[in-house]
Amino acid sequence: MEKFEGYSEKHKSRQQYFVYPLLFQEYIYAFAHDYGLNGSEPVEIVSCNNKKFSSLLVKRLIIRMYQQNFWDKSVNHPNQDRLLDYKNYFYSEFYSQILSEGFAIVVEIPFSLRELSCPKEKEIPKFQNLRSIHSIFPFLEDKFLHLDYLSHIEIPYPIHLEILVQLLQYRIQDVPSLHLLRFFLNYYSNWNSFITSMKSIFLFKKENKRLFRFLYNSYVSEYEFFLLFLRKQSSCLPLASSGTFLERIHFSRKMEHFGIMYPGFSRKTLWFFMDPLMHYVRYQGKAILASKGTFFLKKKWKCYLINFWQYYFCFWTQPRRIHINQLANSCFDFLGYLSSVPKSPLLVRNQMLENSFLIDTRMKKFDTIVPATPLIGYLSKAEFCTGSGHPISKPIWTDLSDWDILDRFGRICRNLFHYHSGSSKKRTLYRLKYILRLSCARTLARKHKSTVRTFMQRLGSAFLEEFFTEEEQVFSLMFTKTTLFSFCGSHTERIWYLDIIRINDLVNPLN
C-alpha cells in the first residue's frame, strides 16, 4: 500500500515555488520572444504577434499590471472580445500574446527547478523502454512482427477547464499563477465555448503555441502516468484496494461514485490487464497500444480508458476514438505512413538426396506505404496542384528570383523523399516529385511569360538537377548487408531518415 501511495505522489512538488512575481520582470518577456525566434520550431509569421517585440510596450504592460483595476474589465465583462478593453486592436492582441508567452515561460520554471534540485548522488532512473521519436520506426519494425492486436487511440483533449487547472495544482502551488491561468482559459472560452467549439481550440493553439503545448503535455502526462502504473503493477493490482491507484484528495467523491457505478472494477477486471507483451507509442494526438493478447483483452483496455477519462477527467469520450484491429488483416495510419504487418507467402525449395520438394511458408513483414491521397491533398491545399493531382503554377512565388523558386520546390521535394525514404513502395513519391517539378516549371514559365515546353528546352538539365539530388541522398542511406546463408549473396535493407523534427507540416499531412 505504501508503495502505491508513494508512486501516486510522484508528480507532486514538495517545495512551493512562487513564480507569479516573475511576470513583472521585463527579461521574462524578452526571453519568451527570443525562444520563439530561436526555438526548435520555425516561427510562423502571420501577424504582428510573432514578428514584433517592443520593449516600450512591455514596460507599459508591466506598469498597467501594477494597477488595481488591471483585470477588472476583462473579468467583470466576460462577453467582450478584447483583452483589457483596449480599443486599439494592435495593443489588445500584443498584450494578450506577450502575456501568455511570458506566463508559459514562468509556469515551466517549477518543473525545471525540480529536475535541477535532484541530488547528484541519486542517479535518475533510466527507462530502457522509453525512446525518442527517432527510434519509433525501427521499434515498430522490430516489435510489431510478433504482436496480434492493435488499438489505435485518438487522444481526446477538450477537457473541462477547471479540471485542467486542478491537474496543475500538484506541480504548481502558486495560487496567483493558477488564477491567471483560469483567466486565460476563460478569456478564450468566452469566444464560443472552449469546451465544445473546435474553432476556439484552434485559435487558442495558434496564438498561444507554447502555453497550449504546456497544458496539453501536462494533461497527457497525467493519463500516461496511470497507464504506466497499470502496465508495471498489473500483477499486484488485484491484491490492492480499488482506490489506491486513482485516488486524489479532491477526487475522493468522484472515486466513491466510481465505486458505486462499477463495484469491484479494479479487483476483478484488472486480472485481464496482465500482458507481458504490450507496447505503447504516442506521437502528437495519436497513440498506439499493441499487444499479443486476445481480442477480449483489448476490449477490456478500451473499456478502462473510456471509464478512466469519464470519471477522472470528468468528460465523455466517444468509443469510436479507440479502434481495435488485427495486425494481420488491417493497416494503421501513424506518422504519415500507412503501416501493416501482412503475411507474405514464401516458397522454399528443399533438396534431400534425390528427392526435392517445395515448402510453402508465410512470413510476417512490417510494410509501410506512403499515403497518396493525404499528401496530394496537402499539395492541393498549398496550391501546387488541383484536388485530382494536376500540377498548377504557384502565382504567389512569381515575384521571387528563379534561384529562390527552384530552391523552395527542391527543398519540399527533398523533405518528402527524406522522410518517406523508409517506404517499401516509391511509386507515390515519384508521382509527388512529378507534381512538384511540373508545378515549378509552370511557375517559372508564368513568371517569364512563356510556355512550359519552351522554358524547359531553354533551361535544360540545370532544371532537373535540383530535383534529382534527393535520390542520391536517399540511395546513400541504403547499405548492403551480406548474410552468411543467402541464395542471392546480398540484399539491401531500409534505413529510416531520422532528421524529421524540422519537417513540421510534411511529417503528418493528415493533421
Curated annotation (Swiss-Prot):
The keyword Secreted does not apply. One of its GO terms (cellular component) is chloroplast. Its main location: plastid. One of its GO terms (biological process) is tRNA processing. It is found in: Plastid, Chloroplast. Keywords: Chloroplast, mRNA processing, Plastid, RNA-binding, tRNA processing. GO terms for molecular function: RNA binding. The keyword Methyltransferase does not apply. It comes from the Eukaryota. It holds the Pfam family Intron_maturas2. InterPro entries: Domain_X (IPR024937), Maturase_MatK (IPR002866), Maturase_MatK_N (IPR024942). Belongs to the intron maturase 2 family. MatK subfamily. Usually encoded in the trnK tRNA gene intron. Probably assists in splicing its own and other chloroplast group II introns. This is Maturase K. The gene is matK.
